Amino acid sequence: MFTQVNTAISRYVNFTREELDIFNSLLYFKQIKKKTIMLQKGEKCTFDAFVVRGCIRKYYIDENGFEVILQFAVENSWISDISFSDYETTGSHVFIETIENTDLLIFSPETKEQLLVRAPRFERAFRILLERHLAVTQNRLLHNITCTAEQRYDDFLQKYPTIPLRVPQHFIASYLGISPEFLSKIRTRKLKS
């Protein structure tokens, strides 16, 4: 179980066995059933979660009442609400929900602080993870502005090749910022070509 998260985090820093043991000792394993809301809008996010198995979505509800998916998290990826900080008092602006039965390795802000004190090189790894997340978010924003819906769908398939087999089509449409009907037309055109 820890092999997955150790491999993922060691891509950024070559940790010693002792550092990884400290990291592993601060994580806890949690199984969550599908369709479980892990974070509600307005709540404080109290976890960083590594997906061992399963699929999760992060979304918000727009002014018209539509769900807008911001992120999918599948195996070997992290999910949290980084938009919320201890300096804000409004709480989270998003929901985090499991799509499938999901196995997670989780740590709280307190255990993350303990980790950074006991194994300071993890700060570099988390900084790199955050920078990568910001780059992905920026690229997605640029794609939404500059690319056609079909180009965005192609990019989505490259980034998340297994998601179309795991989630309803309307979730993918929401992520792409298009209607399910328009996504269906794109998929039909692709099948014909």
Model-derived regions, located:
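Cyclic-nucleotide recognition modules
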Residues: 69-127
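Hydrophobic/aromatic-rich structural module bridging two neighboring secondary-structure elements via a short loop
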Residues: 62-70
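Cyclic nucleotide-binding regulatory module and flanking cytosolic helices
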Residues: 1-28, 84
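Phosphate-/nucleic-acid-contacting segments
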Residues: 147-193
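A generic structural motif
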Residues: 59-61, 99
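Short phosphate-coordinating micro-motif centered on Lys-Gly-acidic
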Residues: 38-43
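Glycine- and acidic-residue-biased ligand/ion/polar-headgroup-sensing regions
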Residues: 35, 46, 50-59, 75-76
